[in-house]
């Protein structure tokens, strides 16, 4: 057992990890070299508790359409990035639209496991990213359309981490 009780509180988190560029805004480039940092720096839509039950994280709730092809995720209000702006549905959309258009090496996960509509066609350039089956309905609502019924989709999204679009526009991979 490791105890951190003798370590003084700090507003700064220091951690050891590995990255493709030395920053962690690039985690959507390669999942295999991200060293678990997204889990420390951002929050997925869902997660699993110690008994492997699916539980909410950023999403306070989710529902599936009657035909099983559309999922709606409602984000918890009041979540913010460390620099102050609110976490928005568009930050999750930005993460996946960036992934699908940059050759993300874990793309099969969102294509096969998640079955996101048009993932492969957008990834290979035969369809525009605007046709990807994800959208921000409003600041707190994400809608996902799948190619086929995926009853386990909320569990798949335990690995969907947002990217702060406002920070990305300012800093990029740097």
Located regions from the model:
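Short, well-ordered beta-strand elements
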Residues: 2-4, 11-20, 70-73, 92-95, ...
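Extracytoplasmic
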Residues: 10-12, 40, 57-59, 66-70, ...
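N-terminal lobe/hinge region of extracytoplasmic solute-binding protein
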Residues: 16-66, 97
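Solvent-exposed loop/turn segments at secondary-structure junctions
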Residues: 20-23, 52, 78-80, 99, ...
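Second-shell loop/turn segments in exported
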Residues: 27-32, 75-83, 130-132
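Extracytoplasmic/secreted proteins, especially bacterial periplasmic and envelope-associated proteins
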Residues: 36, 40, 53, 57, ...
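Aromatic- and charge-enriched surface segment that lines or borders ligand/interaction sites
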Residues: 60-108, 143
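Surface-exposed binding/hinge segments that line
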Residues: 74, 91, 100-101, 105-169
């Amino acid at each position: 057992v490791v105890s951190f009780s003798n370590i003084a509180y700090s507003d700064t988190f220091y951690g050891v990890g590995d990255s493709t560029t030395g920053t962690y805004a690039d985690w959507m480039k390669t999942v295999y070299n991200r060293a678990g940092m997204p889990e420390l720096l951002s929050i997925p839509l869902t997660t699993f508790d110690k008994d492997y039950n699916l539980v909410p994280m950023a999403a306070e709730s989710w529902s599936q359409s009657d035909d099983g092809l559309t999922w709606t995720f409602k984000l918890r209000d009041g979540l913010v990035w460390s620099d102050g702006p609110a976490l928005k549905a568009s930050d999750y959309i930005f993460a996946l639209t960036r992934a699908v258009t940059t050759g993300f090496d874990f793309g099969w996960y969102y294509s096969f496991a998640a079955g996101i509509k048009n993932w492969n066609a957008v990834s290979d350039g035969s369809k525009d990213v605007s046709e990807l089956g994800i959208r921000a309905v409003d600041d707190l609502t994400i809608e996902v359309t799948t190619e086929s019924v995926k009853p386990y989709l909320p569990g798949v999204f335990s690995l969907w981490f947002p990217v702060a679009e406002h920070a990305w526009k300012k800093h990029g991979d740097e």
